[in-house]
Amino acid sequence: MPQPNRPRKGSMGFSPRKRAESEVPRFNSWPADDGEVGLQGFAGYKAGMTHVVLVDDKANAPTEGMETTVPVTVVETPPMRAAAVRLYEDTPYGKKPLTEVWADDTHESLDRTLSVPDEGGDTDELIEALDTEEIADIRVITHTVPGDTAGVPKKNPDVMETRVGGGTLADRLEFAADLIEDGGVHAFGDVFRAGEFTDAAGITKGKGTQGPVKRWGVQKRKGKHARQGWRRRIGNLGPWNPSRVRSTVPQQGQTGYHQRTELNKRLIDINDGDEPTPDGGFPNYGEVDGPYTLVKGSVPGPEQRLVRFRPAVRPNESPRLDPEVRYVSTASNQG
């Protein structure tokens, strides 16, 4: 008889499994600097899911050129605004902020979240005074605009940092300066194109405190062990020595409301209007009537949750731009 063996239940790569610090997800890495100069991120609000019928454009696939049904997530993506430019420098302890310049005219809702300077800076003087050799990275402080999404009743904007990529360092600095001087308004279509692959980050649906069976996926007790009064507890907390409980032991605790980033999510369509809204609206969201994006598959988080996108850092296939969508289902999700 072979020696019985199996991997442990649950991944330690996600520990400690605690609540996310903020409902705005963060990106710790960005794509390489190739292509045109532009922002490398955008954000929207998850409305719900539906399905579309599109023509399979994958080469050599058994269904190439045929109509296929694909599940999609509808993300409402109204225009965002850029409020400031922040420059970073390299230090022995990582990248640290070097300086920042705020726009002269910021949105009134931003005062509810941040202490915005009374007067903005002069970007031209900043470019002339700074030595580009000191600059390690250029990022833009962007935020959503409350009221642009009727399904998300928020008064405070969601603020985040978005990297400027592509071109040379001087080109990126000029792009960021021009962006905030022109009002900072930018759309999802200015950053992405239908058919591209992106990484979607969000805060998952919170489930509160759960036991080890649901939290870690351990097996329930069987047979005689199940007749000891409980079935959903682990057998023991570890050996006598070392006389402590190790962090690898599956125990009950917080489940859900974690930040998760899903790689290589294909953008099926970038459009404007109420076409994807089902009969009766999306449950817990309502109607989508404005700029929206259809993402293949699911994205982390419940309805109304903020979802951030960036260009794929590890694409597993070449992008197939502008897929042909022939039908978007608007059947009611309420039965």
Swiss-Prot record:
GO molecular function: RNA binding; rRNA binding; structural constituent of ribosome
Pfam name, any one: Ribosomal_L3
Annotated family: Belongs to the universal ribosomal protein uL3 family.
Record bears the keyword Metal-binding: no
Main function: One of the primary rRNA binding proteins, it binds directly near the 3'-end of the 23S rRNA, where it nucleates assembly of the 50S subunit.
Biased composition (Polar residues): 244-256
Protein origin, superkingdom: Archaea
Region (Disordered): 1-35, 234-256, 312-335
BP GO terms, sorted: translation
InterPro entries associated with the record: L3_arc_euk, Ribosomal_L3_dom_3_arc_sf, Ribosomal_uL3, Ribosomal_uL3_arc, Ribosomal_uL3_CS, Transl_B-barrel_sf
Keyword Transport: no
Subunit and partners: Part of the 50S ribosomal subunit. Forms a cluster with proteins L14 and L24e.
Keywords of the record: Ribonucleoprotein, Ribosomal protein, RNA-binding, rRNA-binding
Source taxonomy: Archaea, Methanobacteriati, Methanobacteriota, Stenosarchaea group, Halobacteria
Name recorded for this polypeptide: Large ribosomal subunit protein uL3
Cellular component per GO, a single term: cytosolic large ribosomal subunit
Family matches, as HAMAP family: Ribosomal_uL3_A
